[in-house]
Each structure stands twice: as structure tokens, then as C-alpha cells.
């Protein structure tokens, strides 16, 4: 054992032992409790960031603690390796996405290994490899057979210059990110999955999950179950009688309809524009907008009158039809009823275009005015119908019932439950993704690739150039024979949404070498006992993975319908930001490592200068670490300088896992100093700590009893904190233990050995390298076995017993001191001790005690 703690040497030695023993390979064991904990697999972007370090350390701590407690634990890792960033990098660097991806994986894997994570690398999954995505294709075909997957036209962003489809994030101010061309909306055939078929189950099953409440609420809102009325406004066109259908949750306001708005893609819009160039021009303008719901919500609401009217289903009055850029064809019926008096968006639209505003609900004590929108205009809890004929005086529920009944009687509509959730469109007009296993034959149409021909392998040598999908230009990939008739045919060039890849990887970890999609091992490990990832995945990834599990269950592949029992959403890692702004308002951001900060006497930053030139920079405040703000900390530099254990210790100590973590260089230094103290104590006392002598608890001296009482008391709290995932207070507990052990005067070697051994085990899940090496060097491994599987220390309740307790002493309600009494002292004895105490004599000023109040175990108050 070396005198000085050298993290690089300590960590290399520990990791060498773990590799030699294949220490983290997990096997199924039906006789043991299992614990399967998974961090959301990373995208191989090139380097780990501190968010990764925090996530994986949380997982690792959980794994090690539970393994010491007898669980059969598994912590796997993989790579979410398909996706657009690889294509962008390929275009920038002129290399195939595969090369960029595999190089990044190799580097990031090396970084993870340097962190000492308890990963079972034999289960590694890479989603861009054919042995993985084969099963995406296989399940897609099964879903196609069952009608869960299907084909229909969908709206996409089309770049007319690059001749390619753009993701929503590639549309900037209505233009293509590369070409700058005005983006168009296009309808193209795409594949969808019927997630809506599972809407109620996805909603109801949230109740049984140990997930954060805000994640559940986000999913509930995304699924968006609504109770309303679906009905139509009758009209006649080209000699045909039809209904313009809408869905509303506010049927009670139907008498206030003054217009209807339809989407630019609505069939009625196309028909009405046939002989009206101004309508067609507006439709074309709408098609150049984004297709994302978020874009629609924030853009200016525009409309154009068609000059065509439909009839109100209950009054027969004409209702003018408008085309609105805010109406999405993909949501509801592609048409909405306009009730300006009681819908804020309709109110603004009506004011802009001078449309009638008709009040049809009222709230007692409130006065309606069309001058400005007020919150109560949309109230349905206190409102009653007015100006609504036979429905006047009815509250919301009664009005909806009566109006729905009348609409049904007239053949116009009825009550309906609807969902905000839409079927999952999985087609992506991109190269770097799972090929959709469909062949297009001129004679047979769309033909599924036969199961024996799977996987359809994605060529890895193509380099995208931004002008269309490279697969469509690759004859070797594109051209094939029809499996049905043998004629010349072409492969589907769309690939699958990368959310497909991440929808089930945790099931494949359980059986990575299976010749089927999953096998019995999957039902042993799944569902995950703990899933860990960022709140940004609360909706799409987590919702799709829940849907995928239910589909796999219904196809008889697995026994579970939910992939994760518990979810932890770790907080973001924050850091200071610094910048300079030029005359044009452009900001240049500087990394905190390149800046010298000055602080006031309370430690608050008050100024900063750039190290390179000594000139001031602006303090931009604390924000999430990001490339855009250049405020990240390179984990590799941290590990190289301080060691992985220091990085792990700081990230666990700085904040509870679910809360934001503010980066602190001083905090990292403090973590490093603490580990040096742990090592230094072990080295300085190595001979005493090597003594393995039994001791009789009853015969221990007071110094030993005091130390054991403190250590076992802190151990009890630390164990509780491990169970509730409060790792920051676990580290606090370890610090208290070290303080107690260092300050123990007169403790015997045997008790020092016991208590230091407790400290090493409490710290081990957080800082495994230094504790593992100390455990081995000081002979604990000879007694208990390697620290990896050493039993978790048990709290000695007898050690917590005290002969004396300390009570707060108050005189006339003011704290004046402390009173030591026997643990089982009677009330009379406590009262006598209180009046005999020197503090009573000092503050009573010769007055006798009138009354003595004793709160058992806490305080005694003498009233004079």
C-alpha cells in the first residue's frame, strides 16, 4: 500500500482485477431476487458529457448497493446509433455515417470503462447493427399482419431545392436549413403504427407505475382523452349533400358559432379553390409552413374567407367557411367550429377579420365585452347558457347532453370520446436508419420481405450529400426481385423512426445472443426495476416504449405490458456562462476553464476576465451545460486530473439525483481532499486496522462505545438514504463517519477496524476504486471476500443504546444549557437535576421554581 493516494494507479489496479474476474457479468438465477437497472442508452455523439457521468453513476451506485444486499443485479449498456446527427456529420466530414458512429462508440466506451462502471459488456447492443435491427423489421412485419402497422399518406416538410424531406428542427423560419429554400408541405405515403388502439391502456396503466407524477401528467396530457361531440354542418356542393364534420368539447357554445375554419389540406378547401386563385395562393402559402404542432401554436394565425357557407345544424343559419393556417388536417376532422365569444384563439381571429362575436354563456356577476378577452369567457364550471333558445339556463353538462341529443336526432352527430394522441408515423425519408422491409413490385404492389430474407441490410458505405436519400441512388440496395412473382422490383427507401430502435433495447439486453427477438431470459429480467433518464424523454420515448411492450405482449413474445416499474429522471448539470457581445449583437461564449472569476466576501461571482487577454467578459448566469453556451466540463479531463472516483463523488454529493446539479470547481477539489483523507487514515493506521480480534461489546471502554454508537447511528441513516436514492446524504453520512473515526481518542484497534470497514462499505457504491483497493490492502478481503460482494454492514442496535441522554434545559422558556440524565431517569430525578444545575442557579437569580415541565427525551423547562 502506497502512502500517497494516486487515483490513476488505484483505479487501474481495481479495474484490472474486475476485468480479470469478469466481475460484472450477470447470469439469470431463479433462486435470487433480481434487480435490473438501466440508464437510457446514449446517442454516440463523440464524447461523454457530465449529464452522462451523472446518469451512469446513479445507476452504478444503485447496482453496487443492491448487489451487496444479495440481489442478482444487472447493469447493461448500448448505443442508440441511428439518426440524423450521423448523417449531418457525414456530410460535413465526407465519411460514411457508419464510420463516424463506430469511431464515436469506441471512444465513448473507453470513457465509460475509465469510470469503473459495473457494466456487463457481454450484453452490449448497437442499434445500427443488423443483428439488432433485424428484429425491428421482423416485428414491423408482424404488426403489419395484425393491422397494427399500416400505410397512409402523411404530411411532411419538403425542400424543393435539395429534393428531400426535412425534420421539423431542420426548418428554420420556414426555410430549409441547408438550401435556404422555402419549405413546402407535401403528402406522401408513409407507414404508421396504431398506438391509438392502446390509448386507454396507456392511460390507465400509468396508475400502477412508480414514476414521477409530472411524467405521468405529461403522458396523460399527450394522450389527451377528451369527452365531446362529433357533428357536422350540412352543405350542398356539386349536387351532393354533405357534412363538414368537427369535434368539440364545448358543445354548450354551439349557438355562438359564427364561422368554421378548415385546414389548407381539407378536401373542401381544394374544391373551393378550383376557380379562386386567391384561395389557391393562400393554400400554397399554408403548405410552406411547418407541420409541427409547436410551430402552429406560435405562428401568426391567418385566414381567408372562401365565400362559401355551411348551415348551422340546429338553426339552419348560414355559417361562413374560412381556410385557417392554424387548423391541422392531421388533428381531429381538419375543421373547427369558430366560437369567438368563448374561445381565445377564435376571439383573436374574429377581431382580426371583423367576424361576429356572439355571447352564449354567462357567469353570474360578470359582464361580457368584446373589447378584450377575459379568462372567464371560456369558463365551463360556473357558466350557464344564454342567448341559446331552448338551452338557456343550462349548465355545461346539461347543455352538452341536450345539444348532443338534438344533434343525434337530426342525424348530424353524437357524443364521442377522442384522443389528442395520433398514430405513430414511423417512415423517415433518411438513409441512416432501419430499412423498412417492403418491396415495391409493378405487378404485386407492396410486398413484405419474407422472414427468411431478414434482415434487409443497410449499406454502410454510403455518404449522404443532402440532396435526397442515398438509398434511392444505390442500385445495389434499390433493385431486387419481387418475392411473389420474381419480376424486377425496388426496395422501400424510407427508414424507420429512431424511436423504434430505442423502444425495446432493454428487452434485447436480457437476451442479446437470442436467435429470436427475445427468449425466456427476457421474462426473467424484465420489466426493468429502475429506469434512469432525462425528463426530456417523458413523452415520446417513454410512451413508445410502453406501446411496444404491449404489442410484444399481445403477440405472445413477453409476459409483461410495462417496460419499467420505476423511473428516475435525473436533474440537469448546470454551470456558469460567460460571453462577449459584438456591435452586431452576436455573442461569443467562453468556457469557464478559460475565465478567471472574482468573488465578493460572500462567495458570489461579481466579475470575470478572459485568461487569454485579461479583458472582461459578461457573466451570463448559470445554465444547463451545452455546446451552444460553451459551458461544459470535459469528463475525461476531470478523470485524468482527479480520477473517476472524485468525479463520481462530486456528482453524487452536489445534489439529490432528481434535482439540478450546479457545477463547482471548489466542490470537485473538496471531493478529492476527502478521498485523500480516507486513504491517509487507512495508510497511517494500517497496522492497527490489520488486527482481527473479536471483542465483547459489553466489556468495551467508553471511547469504543462512543465511536460504535456514532458509526452505527450514521450507518442506519445511510442505509435508509440508499434505499430512497438520496445519495447526496449518503456521502454526508460517510463524511461524518470519517470525522468520527479520525477524532476517536482511545479507541481500540479492533473497533477501529470494524468502524473503518463500515465506512469503506458505505462509500464503496459511490467510489468503488479507492474503497476496493483499501479493502484489499488492509486485509478485509481475506475476512469478508472482495468488496464487490462483501455483505452490507448490519446496524448493531445495541450499539445505539445510551446509558445517558441529553435534554435541553430551559429557564422560563429560554434555552440556557443542556442536562445529562440517565436514560431511564424518573420525572422526579430529572426535576431534581434541573434545579441542581449551575445554569438554574445562574439564571433563576435566587427565585424558587414555580413549575417544572418535562418533555420526555427532549427538554426540561423550569418556570420561576
Curated annotation (Swiss-Prot):
GO cellular component: cytosol
Compartments reported by the entry: Cytoplasm
Pfam families the UniProt entry points to: Anticodon_1, tRNA-synt_1, tRNA-synt_1_2, tRNA-synt_1g
Catalysed reactions listed for this entry: tRNA(Leu) + L-leucine + ATP = L-leucyl-tRNA(Leu) + AMP + diphosphate
Protein name in the entry: Leucine--tRNA ligase
InterPro entries on file: aa-tRNA-synth_I_CS (IPR001412), aa-tRNA-synth_Ia (IPR002300), Leu-tRNA-ligase (IPR002302), Leu_tRNA-synth_edit (IPR025709), M/V/L/I-tRNA-synth_anticd-bd (IPR013155), Methionyl/Leucyl_tRNA_Synth (IPR015413), Rossmann-like_a/b/a_fold (IPR014729), tRNAsynth_Ia_anticodon-bd (IPR009080)
EC number(s) per entry: 6.1.1.4
A single GO molecular function term of this UniProt record: aminoacyl-tRNA deacylase activity
Position of sequence motif 'KMSKS' region: 624-628
